[in-house]
């Protein structure tokens, strides 16, 4: 997921670039090609210069926590994460206590309440979407993440929200800074047939678009604010509609993932499904 900036989805396989004096230099990753994101989260490495972890995992056996990063290829280090949870014994499950920001802005998603943490490992095995071996974070009722500090997603009334997810329930919030109907805040949600965007300003308002979401596959959803009053809604790179929104500068707030936000605690409109590695 990417918040703010001008990030775009890139298709195809990465190339390997050869240095002039021999050897290989790594192919540019998403944030190398499209820098400037206010925050970015993934189970895949998004920036070659990023040296931090992907996530912090709490294991169920003894509640110990540890940071896990990436392999040399930039994939999530599933082997180390699985071994950590197995060593803890018990149910051998793993839960996300922190999802690290790879943009360099250090605005991390976190959940300190163990009962609300999203699962990533079950019985010692990293969860996948069932069609390949790519890791996913499971989204379900009463579980969600929230940024550890405020973020301005639409600086100067321009910005992009990009997410890759699968929704298997009738309704759920992808991400939001929903504080109250009278504030300058927003909520992005989806059902198994629609994608919706709520822009709360001067009394509020919302728009839902029939997007024919395929619940059996992951969807790439993008919301691109190009001016004060125009918000473009895209599914898998195809524009669905330009929405007319209030010409307001959104407040810098904490962003909630998987539910809407009351204060700083995830609460309600839970997303049921999963987030993919990017």
Range-by-range predicted roles:
Residues 2-5, 9-114, 273-277:
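GGW-centered surface loops in extracellular recognition modules
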Residues 8, 224, 259-262:
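Low-complexity, glycine/proline-biased repetitive segments and flexible coils/loops
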Residues 43, 88-92, 97-143, 152-153, ...:
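Extracellular glycan-interaction surfaces
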Residues 49-61, 137, 174-175, 253-258:
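Short, hydrophobic/proline-enriched secondary-structure or compact coil segments at domain edges
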Residues 57-69, 142-148, 181-187, 202-208, ...:
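Short, surface-exposed beta-strand/loop "edge" segments at domain boundaries and coil↔beta transitions
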Residues 73-85, 194-197, 217, 250-256:
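Short, surface-exposed linear segments at secondary-structure transitions and domain or protein termini
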Residues 156-159, 275:
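Extended extracellular/luminal ectodomain segments enriched in beta-structured repeat modules
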Residues 200-205, 251-277:
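Extracellular glycan-interaction patches encoded by glycine-rich segments
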């Amino acid at each position: 997921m990417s918040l703010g900036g001008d990030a775009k989805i890139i298709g195809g396989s990465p190339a390997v670039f050869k240095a002039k004096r021999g050897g290989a230099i790594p192919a540019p990753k998403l944030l190398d090609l499209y820098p400037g994101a206010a925050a970015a989260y993934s189970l895949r490495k998004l920036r070659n210069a990023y040296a931090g972890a992907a996530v912090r995992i709490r294991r169920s056996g003894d509640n110990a926590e540890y940071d896990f990063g990436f392999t040399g290829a930039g994939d999530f280090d599933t082997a180390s994460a699985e071994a950590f949870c197995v060593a803890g014994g018990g149910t051998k499950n793993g839960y996300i206590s922190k999802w690290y920001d790879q943009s360099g802005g250090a605005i991390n998603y976190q959940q300190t309440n163990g009962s609300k943490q999203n699962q990533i490992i079950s019985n010692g095995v990293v969860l996948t979407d069932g069609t390949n071996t790519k890791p996913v974070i499971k989204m379900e009722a009463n579980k969600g993440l929230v940024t550890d500090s405020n973020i301005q997603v639409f600086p100067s009334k321009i910005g992009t929200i990009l997410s890759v997810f699968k929704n298997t329930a009738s309704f759920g919030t992808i991400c939001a800074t929903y504080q109250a109907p009278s504030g300058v805040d927003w909520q992005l949600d989806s059902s198994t047939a629609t994608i919706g965007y709520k822009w709360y300003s001067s009394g509020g308002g919302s728009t839902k678009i029939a997007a024919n979401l395929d619940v059996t596959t992951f969807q790439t959803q993008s919301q691109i604010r190009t001016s004060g009053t125009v918000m473009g809604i895209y599914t898998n790179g195809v524009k669905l509609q330009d929405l007319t929104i209030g010409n307001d500068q959104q407040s810098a707030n904490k962003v909630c993932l998987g539910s809407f936000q009351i204060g700083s605690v995830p609460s309600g409109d839970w997303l049921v499904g999963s987030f993919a590695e990017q």
